[in-house]
């Protein structure tokens, strides 16, 4: 059974105020005292089922599962063999978190227990001032979190909470929503449950004018303004990439938790949270898989305005199309082995996919710093106007992660699909056609 303490960690991660006198980054909390190659993702599917009660009050079904958890929390020890007794869970958790508070950080949440070992009905985090209701076995009750006062712990979770005077809003308007049935592993918790940061993003986006496009930059600015207000030390400020997107990795420095988010909305991705290390995140993960071209709508290419930009993109695609045709017709060319084309792809899409695979030497799904060099040489040699070349790679890297995905390459070249059709408006037909890959001669531009 999952320890309730783990359910509250992401909640508290959002509530903890940042340390004022020191700057942190995601790399600050990378684990350095353990073997970098240490694997905490053991497969325990076939392990013998012999329950163990750990020092934090959790029951592990096998020694393998315990070792997997201990890998992430070296302080964890085996208390005794067999299932943990429910009556002692609160006491065990309290003892464990008190030890954590002494050794790690003072802001850790420490539960309150009744004389019979069950959890007290009201639990509070003194460092942040938030209180909420729990069941006798420690499960948080949804919708009961309030700031700087004692919540009404209902017989029914649907009972209304007290309202602020004159506002008509409940006290938990800015508080995180708590769940009554937590499920999942420890590494899931910070992303599976709504964090205060998520709730803040939702709140700010709801206040945004419906006619305007919400972006990370706007949320970042709003968070900075909120942080200036009295008693708003718990505001979490999102990290932003270029183009109004969120950085794929978001972290809370005070606790060392990091998680992956959808770059267009900032919402956490379930199952991605880690502690004291950066998770591996998809730089293109989106809530709404948008047309790649939309990311570049209105995006300025420095030194290459309007008609010059159109001329430049046309020359790049024209040269790439010609190179693909020549590669396909030259048996000695290492790049001539073309994969079977997707029948739904237009010529320009086939060209971009072909060239992307050519550059992506390690098949990682993106073009890294070293792999991008041939593309830069290609642009300098075969495209015009030359003024458009200088900043084009930076223009393509819309999320500023120093690499280019196939979606970014298609988008910055203006060939992303829109309603099932490629964006080929106003563009001249490329000089060489990929029909030669089907044993047909390339059609010359008339």
UniProtKB/Swiss-Prot annotation:
GO terms for biological process: extracellular matrix organization; positive regulation of angiogenesis; positive regulation of DNA biosynthetic process; positive regulation of endothelial cell chemotaxis; positive regulation of endothelial cell migration; positive regulation of fibroblast growth factor receptor signaling pathway; positive regulation of mitotic cell cycle; positive regulation of vascular endothelial growth factor signaling pathway. Residues 161-172, 217-228 have a biased composition (Basic and acidic residues). InterPro entries: Dev_reg/Prot_inhib, EF-hand-dom_pair, EF_Hand_1_Ca_BS, EF_hand_dom, Kazal_dom, Kazal_dom_sf, SMOC2_EC, SPARC/Testican_Ca-bd-dom. This is SPARC-related modular calcium-binding protein 2. Residues 34-86 form the Kazal-like domain. The gene is SMOC2. It is linked to Dentin dysplasia 1: A dental defect in which both primary and secondary dentitions are affected. The clinical crowns of both permanent and deciduous teeth are of normal shape, form and color in most cases, although they may be slightly opalescent and blue or brown. Teeth may be very mobile and exfoliate spontaneously because of inadequate root formation. On radiographs, the roots are short and may be more pointed than normal. Pulp chambers are usually absent except for a chevron-shaped remnant in the crown. Root canals are usually absent. Ca(2+) 1 binds at residues 360, 362, 364, 366, 371.
